[in-house]
Amino acid sequence: MAQPTHSEIQAVDPVLTNMLVGYMQADDRFIASRLFPAVPISTQSATYYAFTKKYWFLDSLQKRAPGTGFARSGYGVETATTSAALWGLEHPIADETRNNNQMPMDLERAGLQWLAQQSLIRKERAFASDFFANGVWGTTDNNSATDWDDFTNGDPINDVLTARRVISNNTGQDGNTLAVGYIVHQAIVNHPDLVDRVKYVQLATMANVEGAIAAAFGVSNYLVGKASYNSANEGQTFSASAIIDDDALVCYVAPQPGIMS
């Protein structure tokens, strides 16, 4: 046999330079920033004003007798405070590690993408904890007997229309947004009531189907939260968990948050 052998002169297999397996989630799987657009502030804490709602729904005009003055009325103003907590994370790269890197991707770029993913996960989890929760909103339905994956008793269209009507009556704005977890989206697309309404979509692309679902619910925005995270501790076996699970939120979202919106 000819010597030296292949295994003797090649201590390790060559590194592929055109392939690198990754598990980074696409940005559009996260919906927090799309559901509630950020309002930038110049200080960590701030005070903001709000008109007192009840005055804007009063029927205050009164008849005026000839030669008399008009009845007078007005509106109230309230203040509230907000505080922006500072979150951060470092990903140090030692010079020795950088110099010995054999991956077909520089470590700074990989680290930047990893940090961006960490930021998205933290924001999405905080968002889900704060807003997909009982007691946060004026109306909550936690009746498992009418879940939307129950194709006999579940009635997603009526539930959403009812929620939109409640929002309209209490705010003067029509609920224009429905946000759901991925498991809820799967129940919706398979529900007979929705299937019957979207079956004539010209081309059953994901965008067309989701647009037809939004139209069936009467909302402008239909958002599906698909992001997941590792719920195990760092040293434990990976455990995938949906950030937004079997939840749905109907709300009004100002297209461009600002003064009087």
Q: Residue spans of the language-model regions?
A:
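N-terminal leader/assembly segments
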Residues: 10-12, 47-73, 89, 98, ...
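Assembly/oligomerization interface modules of large self-assembling protein complexes
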Residues: 22-91
